[in-house]
Regions:
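Bacterial Sec-dependent N-terminal signal peptides
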Residues: 1-29
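Sec-dependent signal peptide cleavage junction
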Residues: 19-74
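Helix-rich interaction surfaces within compact, conserved domain-sized segments
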Residues: 23-34, 138-208
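N-terminal post-signal-peptidase region of extra-cytosolic proteins
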Residues: 66-67, 84-99
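Residue-level detector of beta-strand structural context in well-folded domains
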Residues: 71, 102, 164-166
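A short, Trp-centered hydrophobic/proline-enriched beta-strand micro-motif
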Residues: 73-88
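Short hydrophobic/aromatic-rich beta-strand segments that constitute the beta-sheet cores
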Residues: 82, 111-115, 175-179
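Mid-length scaffold segments of soluble, non-membrane domains
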Residues: 94-147
Length: 208
């Protein structure tokens, strides 16, 4: 009788253990499933971020292309303004400036060069710098194999006699202009963007 009772207890224990194993997943299986789910979530987020970056890059490239075409057309029409937000002096000193008051503007045979700094005095142009106006001659445009546009010209007038070199790279309206005075070595470089005249919002001070 005792042996029968012990046998029944053993059988019941085996049945209970089997039932528990069938109805509850093991911790290892749970962790594996959770890990795979997390991995899929992370991979999904990375894929979305990559797709978003690609979309943003493509949109920016389209915008840059439009701006570049506008700038190139304006340069060919000799009707543009380079609005600068940085001025680099002869020995590499840099001044960050307001693009509304620092520019080189060309309108057919006339050019205006203006610089204005954040200083406590008005200067000759009344806004902290100098504004000069002159006639354009020797206007030339060259585009190399890489699509870089180089514009060269001479500007002569009251207070200015200089060679001007403008460089604009393929696919962007970002540009720089080097101003090389004919009677001194005080070279000046302005970095900014080229805009058609009708889109430029510069403020002109008093000319010399």
């Amino acid at each position: 009788m005792k042996k029968i009772f012990l046998s029944l207890l053993l059988i019941m224990s085996m049945i209970t253990s089997f039932s528990y194993a069938q109805s509850n997943p093991s911790d290892d299986m749970y962790q594996i499933t959770k890990s795979k789910a997390n991995e899929q979530l992370v991979n999904g987020l990375k894929a979305r971020q990559k797709a978003l970056k690609n979309e943003q890059r493509a949109l920016q490239n389209r915008i840059d292309s439009v701006l570049w075409n506008e700038a190139l057309t304006a340069v060919k029409d000799t009707a543009f303004t380079l609005e600068a937000d940085k001025v680099v002096f002869k020995y590499g000193q840099i001044a960050y400036v307001n693009s509304n008051t620092n520019f080189v503007s060309v309108n057919k045979d006339n050019a205006i060069v203006q610089v204005a700094f954040n200083v406590p005095f008005a200067g000759p142009n009344g806004i902290g710098g100098v504004t000069v106006q002159g006639s354009v001659s020797g206007y030339k445009i060259q585009i190399d194999k890489k699509g870089t546009t180089l514009v060269t010209m001479n500007v002569t007038g009251v207070g200015i006699s200089a060679q001007i070199w403008i460089t604009m790279y393929q696919g962007t309206h970002d540009a720089n202009v080097e101003i090389l005075p004919n009677f001194s070595s005080e070279r000046l470089t302005l970095n900014g963007v080229i805009l058609p005249l009708h889109k430029s919002t510069v403020y002109q001070g008093r000319t010399l």
